[in-house]
Amino acid sequence: MNHLYRSFKTIALVGKPRNDINLQMHKNLFHWLMERGYQVLVEKEVAITLELPFEHLATLEEIGHRAQLAIVIGGDGNMLGRARVLAKYDIPLIGINRGNLGFLTDIDPKNAYSQLEACLERGEFFVEERFLLEAKIERASEIVSTSNAVNEAVIHPAKIAHMIDFHVYINDKFAFSQRSDGLIVSTPTGSTAYSLSAGGPILTPNLNAIALVPMFPHKLTSRPLVVDGDSKISIRFAEHNTSQLEVGCDSQITLPFTPDDVVHIQKSEHKLRLLHLKNYNYYNVLSSKLGWLKSF
């Protein structure tokens, strides 16, 4: 076999299978890669379930240090969870879509092996970088908790259907005050996720921009605001707010805080590196996922 175009020697399989079909795909792909001479690592929990030899077991951190590519099997949720961890290791990710929409998972499971062969064996791919957000909780002038987010950081009360009052500062300058169910702070990657459902704008992935999208604001003039991607966003809260507030990162990580704390959100120093097939077209993804069909 011609290995002229091979860019990767060690490839990791990651994801959390929801059913036997997804688990079987992990197993099949493991053997497919092994047969082609790749060194293969498999996320620890899956490898144990599949009873793979010990040398193939690896945590996400070990994968970050040892692998040159991670293949995510699952939906966007699986991609988000792995991307937050692996971004700091500068390892590219490509996804096989086993979820619903699949904005971040390019590969069609029906054509997975032919598409992977084009990518891995013939070098028919390119790498796209996308920025992450970093959310921090400041308490008494000290940072007490932090998390990255690929899609969005959402400020909201711990209990549903509770409104909160807050002020938003951009680069330490007052921008606006709001009474609402919360605020979505979204990356361009996240603009087609929760932000879109809340009426936020779609931002193409190459934009250096952050969207601030209110959640059920108690003011008809409240509208989404798009700011420079290098902005530092700070949110301060009224004392009469409920004592249990949260920042949700990609709906997977929760940072609790109180009205006395300050939430800071800005671009993370780490970037998500997405590996795309050569014929990838972002606008085709939008039209297929959102039903933007040609009328003539």
From Swiss-Prot:
This enzyme's EC code(s): 2.7.1.23
GO function terms (MF aspect): ATP binding; metal ion binding; NAD binding; NAD+ kinase activity
Enzyme class: transferase
Matches recorded under InterPro entries: ATP-NAD_kinase_N (IPR017438), ATP-NAD_kinase_PpnK-typ_C (IPR017437), NAD/diacylglycerol_kinase_sf (IPR016064), NADK (IPR002504)
Gene3D superfamilies: Probable inorganic polyphosphate/atp-NAD kinase, domain 1, Probable inorganic polyphosphate/atp-NAD kinase, domain 2
BP term (GO), one: NAD metabolic process
Obligatory cofactor(s): a divalent metal cation
General function of this protein: Involved in the regulation of the intracellular balance of NAD and NADP, and is a key enzyme in the biosynthesis of NADP. Catalyzes specifically the phosphorylation on 2'-hydroxyl of the adenosine moiety of NAD to yield NADP.
Protein name, UniProt field: NAD kinase
Taxonomic source organism: Haemophilus influenzae (strain 86-028NP)
Gene: nadK
